[in-house]
Regions:
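Bacterial N-terminal signal peptides
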Residues: 7-15
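C-terminal outer-membrane/trafficking sorting elements
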Residues: 365-406
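Structural signature of tandem-repeat unit edges
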Residues: 41-48, 66-80, 90-103, 113-126, ...
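Consensus positions within tandem repeat domains that build extended binding/scaffold surfaces
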Residues: 82-87, 105-110, 128-133, 151-156, ...
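Secondary-structure capping and domain/repeat boundary segments
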Residues: 307-365
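Positively charged n-region of N-terminal signal peptides that target proteins for export
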Residues: 1-4, 406
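Boundary at the C-terminal end of the N-terminal hydrophobic targeting segment
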Residues: 18-20
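LRR flanking "cap" motifs
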Residues: 24-79, 332
Length: 406
């Protein structure tokens, strides 16, 4: 009889017929679960909060069967995703979190390496620590406007993540929240954020520019450490603290714009391995002298004052249509021995793609300059006398760069 049973099982298997196993139980006061191993679906039914688990030996009841799970169905009416709920469900491909959920627990989806899509419901207010860490299949994430806090390590080492949209209610980005997201190329930090945690974006090598809004008061240590692709950073005017190594090893930085009226007191390692002789530091025009005297900031060779201008758009009848504020970054003028740079002269006052500028110099008293002077250090640079001043004509066009602020 045993031989016949073995034969029949083998026959069913060879015909592609497999026997489904059903596992079930409770996962909350009013929630139950059922796992069908044949269709790889874990179905949660009921309403209310899910139980929290805490790891060995306290695992979710389906943890031993996690290798079967590819799909999870969550009901409208569930209000929380428990701690460690779906940790290490490496076959899970996507998750849709219903609008009834208000909280995603710590480690809830940690290690779900096959997950390529996540939809976060519009009533979620908190994303727990390590909630989506090591979800290495994720390429984009939208955090809805309902969320107020992103936990520590929330998306840590999601190294295929290329873009993140952070909702406009988030007040804090946790430590290492996006650390190691090396493919991240775009992130917009909303005006609601006040704190950027330690290591929040460390080793995000794909980032090329970051704007830290005026709402932020503190940038944590190592927040952008090792972001070697970062070329431009704008620091809002409310930032009072910048932690150690915040921008260390950001070797590609060419522009740092700091709107703080008073230079922050920072450690010498904040900009370690940033080339301060080529990276331009843009500051408020009236604060230039303060930065030139402040520790660390004074190490930047090129400290340039910037101005804000309101640009008004009018129709043909001069009726105002719209206005916005633009920050104009004045380029760094060439240094020419024997001459002192005194300012920029505009060729046109009409702002289109940029204002064309001419560098204006005065000859030093000890230097006798001809009407046309060729810089021996760079023959392409010629100074032409115009009254009591000299104007640089080097075949280049210098333009103020306009950046939208509001």
């Amino acid at each position: 009889m045993k031989k016949i049973s073995i034969f029949l099982l083998a026959l069913f298997a060879s015909a592609g017929i497999t026997q489904a196993s059903i596992f079930d139980g409770s996962c909350g006061a009013n929630l139950t679960w059922s796992l069908n191993t044949q269709d790889s679906t874990l179905t949660i039914t009921g309403s209310g909060e899910m139980t929290n688990w805490h790891g060995d030996p306290d695992f979710a009841p389906w943890y031993d069967y996690k290798s079967y799970i590819k799909y999870v169905s969550l009901p409208d009416g569930i209000t929380s995703i428990g701690d460690w709920a779906f940790r290490d469900c490496s076959g899970l491909t996507s998750i849709e979190i219903p609008n009834s959920v208000t909280g995603i627990g710590s480690d809830a989806f940690d290690g779900c390496s096959s997950m390529t899509s996540v939809t976060i419901g519009n009533r979620v207010t908190s994303i727990g620590n390590t909630a989506f860490s090591y979800c290495t299949g994720l390429t984009s994430v939208t955090i809805p406007n309902s969320v107020t806090g992103i936990g520590d390590y929330a998306f840590y080492e999601c190294y295929r993540l290329t873009s993140v949209t952070i909702g406009n209610s988030v007040t804090g980005i946790g430590s290492s929240a996006f650390g190691g997201c090396s493919s991240l190329t775009s992130v917009t930090i909303p005006n609601s954020v006040t704190i950027i945690g330690e290591g929040a974006f460390f080793l995000c090598n794909g980032l090329t520019s970051v704007t830290i809004p005026n709402s932020v008061t503190s940038i944590g240590g190592s927040a952008f450490l090792g972001c070697s692709g970062l070329s431009s950073v704008t620091i809002g005017n409310s930032v009072t603290g910048i932690g150690d190594k915040a921008f260390k090893d950001c070797t590609g930085l060419t522009f740092v714009t700091n709107y703080a009226a008073t230079p922050q007191s920072i450690n010498s390692n904040v900009f370690d391995n940033v080339n301060k002789s080529t990276c331009v530091l843009n500051v408020a025009k009236e604060s230039v002298s303060l930065y030139q005297a402040a520790n660390v900031w004074k190490d930047f060779t090129n400290i340039v004052g910037v101005d804000d201008y309101t640009i008004n758009y009018v129709d043909k009848d001069s009726q105002a249509l719209y206005n916005h504020v633009v920050t104009l970054y004045v380029p760094v003028a060439p240094t020419i021995t024997g001459f002192t740079f005194v300012g920029w002269q505009t060729v046109s006052t009409m702002l289109t793609d940029g204002i064309t500028l001419q560098a204006v110099y005065q000859a030093d008293e000890s230097f006798s300059a001809p009407a046309v002077y060729t810089n021996p250090a760079n023959p392409a640079q010629k100074l032409s006398k115009n009254g009591n001043i000299y104007i640089l004509t080097d075949g280049k066009t210098y333009n103020m760069q306009g950046q939208l602020v509001k």
